[in-house]
């Protein structure tokens, strides 16, 4: 099954990711609240923008999170790793219920406003391959590094 879900901490109706057109490869993600992204200072953690969404992927798939092409020019928002990779075992993550976040650096000198319902970026489902003698058998025990940064 490949599907988006609302995370448990969200009680209100939120917009789940959706494709804008029939030929869109990515699903648009939306901010669940108004936030202000402060200007980046060297050494700052990236600013986390909540989506309120988790994703279930099929085996040998991941969801790639990418920035909107207009964000760097219009809002001066860049993603620190260029992309985000959401593995199948991140679903139901005990640290945050598998909620996905978009991480940004604001490279302007002024705070940037993101409004509730505004498009943040896109998620693109991707297949991946494994080597023939792959022996990975571990399980995800915790979330990723940013579970410590949720308070921005």
Residues covered by each model-derived region:
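DUTPase catalytic domain/fold
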Residues: 1-152
């Amino acid at each position: 099954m490949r599907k988006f879900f609302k995370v448990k901490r969200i009680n209100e109706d939120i917009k789940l990711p959706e494709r804008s057109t029939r030929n869109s490869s990515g699903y648009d993600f939306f901010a669940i609240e108004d936030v202000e992204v402060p200007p980046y200072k060297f050494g700052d953690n990236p600013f986390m923008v909540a989506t309120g969404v988790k994703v279930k992927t099929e085996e040998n798939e991941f969801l790639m999170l990418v920035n909107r092409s207009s964000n760097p020019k219009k809002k001066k928002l860049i993603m620190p790793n260029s992309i985000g990779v959401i593995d199948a075992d991140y679903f139901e993550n005990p640290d945050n219920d598998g909620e996905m976040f978009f991480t940004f650096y604001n490279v302007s000198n002024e705070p940037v406003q993101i409004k509730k319902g505004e498009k943040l970026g896109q998620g693109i489902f991707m297949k991946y391959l494994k080597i023939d003698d792959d022996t990975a058998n571990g399980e995800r025990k915790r979330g990723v590094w940013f579970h410590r940064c949720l308070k921005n």
